[in-house]
A protein has these predicted regions:
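Intrinsically disordered, low-complexity Ser/Thr/Pro-rich tracts
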Residues: 1-27
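Short, low-complexity N-terminal intrinsically disordered segments enriched in polar/charged residues
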Residues: 19-49, 54-57, 61-68, 75-82, ...
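Short low-complexity, flexible loop/linker segments enriched in glycine and/or proline
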Residues: 71-72, 238
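Peptidyl-prolyl cis-trans isomerase
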Residues: 67, 186, 206-208
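Surface-exposed, charged secondary-structure patches
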Residues: 73-203
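Hydrophobic beta-strand residues in large extracellular and virion-surface proteins
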Residues: 40-43, 194-200, 211-213, 220-222
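Short beta-strand edge/turn micro-motifs at domain boundaries
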Residues: 26, 124-125, 138-142, 150, ...
Length: 248
């Protein structure tokens, strides 16, 4: 499964702009938004249109790396994990370029996992990132055919944003995390971090999109999929914060 995720990530990145190209600002991230809800709405509109580059451009990428206080963040976390630390500004200009690329790639990999979770064919154990044995003749063909048949991106074309739900209504514990979010914002070098919950209609069914957004000065960017509220709700990291209302 890990090899499959790597292959999907390579395809995603091949379809995305090179560093410093592709968006209106000449960067991987877009110009930012006037509110957290606008940032999430732009992400969902791009998702509906099957526009991966547009989805990723709603996130803080260059700004994320440029404003991050690596020492403060490591002190907050209390541990250095290479898989996380690679997106932190740890060195000079070269390493910062690497951190930007890693940040972009990790977001793309999260979207690859989300697509796989919701496209997963029937007849297999639930998707959890584990390997799937395809050792018999015809296994690979059947597996790929199942993924193609269940292509979640086709369903997402029917997505409509109905409105937004206050995260406190989703979990009474959200307000208790205000100090934790403030410490995170301080180490990230942003002014504010909030969770956003968008209420969606997808093919006549009610869904929610949970994610965190960050304010840098007057501009808002999406910060992370799932986000603080998603963790409180117990959402799978593979979900990318997208969950049917029936799951609650």
């Amino acid at each position: 499964m890990k090899k499959l995720l790597i292959c999907l990530l390579a395809l995603l990145l091949a379809a995305s702009p090179a560093l410093g190209e592709g968006t209106e600002t000449g960067a991987l991230e877009g110009p930012g938004f006037g509110s957290a809800e606008e940032a999430v709405t732009a992400y969902l509109e791009a998702m509906k249109n099957g526009d991966l580059e547009g989805m990723l451009a709603t996130f803080a990428i260059e700004t994320y790396v440029a404003e991050m206080d690596a020492q403060a963040d490591l002190e907050r976390m209390g541990v250095f994990q290479p898989s996380y630390g690679m997106r932190l500004p740890l060195g000079g200009d070269y390493q910062r370029q690497v951190a930007v690329a890693v940040r972009y790639g990790q977001l793309a990999e999260s979207l690859a996992s989300q697509w796989m979770l919701y496209s997963w064919p029937e007849g297999y154990a639930a998707f959890d990132g584990a390997s799937v044995a395809l050792s018999e003749d015809g296994d690979a063909e059947a597996f790929l055919a199942g993924l193609a048949e269940g292509d979640a991106a086709a369903l997402w074309q029917e997505m409509e944003v109905v409105g937004f739900v206050e995260p406190e209504r989703m979990s009474t514990q959200y307000s208790d995390g205000s100090q934790s979010r403030a410490r995170q914002a301080a180490s990230y070098g942003c002014d504010e971090i909030v969770s956003v919950v968008a209420k969606l209609d997808i093919g006549g069914e009610e869904w929610y999109q949970c994610m965190d957004a960050a304010r840098y000065g007057e501009k808002w960017y999406n910060l992370s999929l799932v986000g603080y509220i998603g963790h409180l709700l117990g959402l799978s990291l593979y979900s990318g914060g997208l969950v049917p209302a029936a799951a609650f």
